[in-house]
């Protein structure tokens, strides 16, 4: 009887993990689709901001596009270089990023965001990033998704701030589409529950 109970508990746990992974894949697929994005703002320098309601989710997705002359591989190099975020993220003093491991074009990392406002708690999360053009398809450069706490091992869990609100629902991606000679439409797409 104890064995059957243990098997049932493990099976339930594995089903929950698979459901979270499936949910993450659905988010990535929805962000990738170009349908149903609503243009919210456009500027003269080609910046465009969009929003999108995703069915079954009580959150908005956001997308920013800009035409640039930056080599898309350079975007992969910069965004996946977690150790140097302080060199290109303007508010990096409020962001702590630590790479946990990396293999085959994907990495796992921990981020802590310090919120310097009264009555607001810091936020933190673990995430997985795939930054390998060969591992992704079509025009994707990078995709990332948040990792559920249940999937974090004990050693990595020691990095988590117990007082921060954990964010476990979110995903994003960088896309690049050629729009002319040495010009690319770069798109960053994001959906995340800010918690609290």
Residue ranges and their predicted role:
Residues 10-19:
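Hydrophobic h-region of N-terminal signal peptides that target proteins for export
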């Amino acid at each position: 009887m104890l064995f059957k109970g243990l098997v049932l508990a493990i099976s339930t746990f594995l089903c929950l993990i698979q459901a979270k992974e499936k949910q993450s894949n659905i988010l990535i697929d929805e962000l990738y689709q170009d349908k149903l994005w609503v243009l919210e703002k456009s500027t003269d320098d080609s910046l465009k901001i969009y929003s999108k309601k995703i069915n079954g989710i009580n959150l908005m997705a956001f997308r920013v596009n800009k035409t640039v002359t930056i080599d898309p591989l350079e975007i992969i190099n910069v965004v996946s270089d977690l150790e140097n975020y302080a060199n290109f993220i303007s508010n990096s003093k409020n962001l702590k990023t630590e790479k946990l491991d990396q293999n085959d074009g994907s990495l796992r990392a921990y981020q802590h965001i310090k919120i310097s406002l009264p009555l607001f708690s810091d936020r933190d999360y673990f995430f997985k990033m795939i930054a390998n053009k060969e591992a992704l398809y079509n025009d994707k450069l990078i995709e990332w998704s948040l990792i559920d706490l249940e999937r974090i091992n004990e050693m990595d869990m020691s990095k988590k701030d117990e007082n921060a609100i954990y964010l476990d629902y979110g995903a994003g991606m960088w896309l690049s589409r050629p729009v002319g000679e040495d010009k690319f439409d770069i798109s960053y797409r994001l959906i995340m529950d800010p918690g609290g």
